[in-house]
Amino acid sequence: MVKSIIYSLTALFVLSGCSLNKKTMTNLEIIKSTYEGKTSEENGQNLAKYVAEDISWTEAKGFPYAGTYIGLDNITKNVFNRLGSEWIDYKFTPEDYVASDDKVVAYGTYTGIYKITGKSFTARVAHVWKLKDSKIISFEQFVDSQTVNDALK
C-alpha cells in the first residue's frame, strides 16, 4: 500500500511537471530583488548574488559618477561608496518595470540631499539591465543629470 502511494505521488510529480527544486527566478524578479528588499543592505546582497564577475556598469555622461566600471569591486568603490558617503537619503524609487527576453528596464525617480551643500534634488531615471543565464552582465543609467548637478553647487 505504501509503495503504491509513493509510486502514485512520483507519477503525479513527473506527469504534472512539478519539481521539488526551487523555482528559478525570472530576469524581472532578479532585478526587482535589487530594489525592493526590506533594507538597502538586502538590495545590495541581492545585487552581489546576481552580478556576473565581469559586469559592465555605466553611469550616464554628465552624472557626477559618469563612466563605465567593470566588476562589483569597481562599481562599489566608484559608485555605491560615494553615494553612501556624499549624500543623505539618496535613493531610487521604482515606478515600474519593463521586461523583454534578456533585458529589464526599471524607471522611476532619484531623490537625495547633497551633504556639502544641503541641497536636495529629484531626477527622473531609467536603468537598463541585461542578463545572461540569470546573471546581470550589464547596467546602463539614463538620468536627468542637470538636477543632480544643481544640488552639487
What annotation goes with each model-predicted range?
Residues M1-T26:
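Bacterial Sec-dependent N-terminal signal peptides
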Residues S19-K23, K77-K153:
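A beta-strand edge to alpha-helix "cap/lid" segment located at domain peripheries
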Residues L20, E36, P64-Y65:
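Generic anion/oxyanion-binding catalytic loop in active/binding sites
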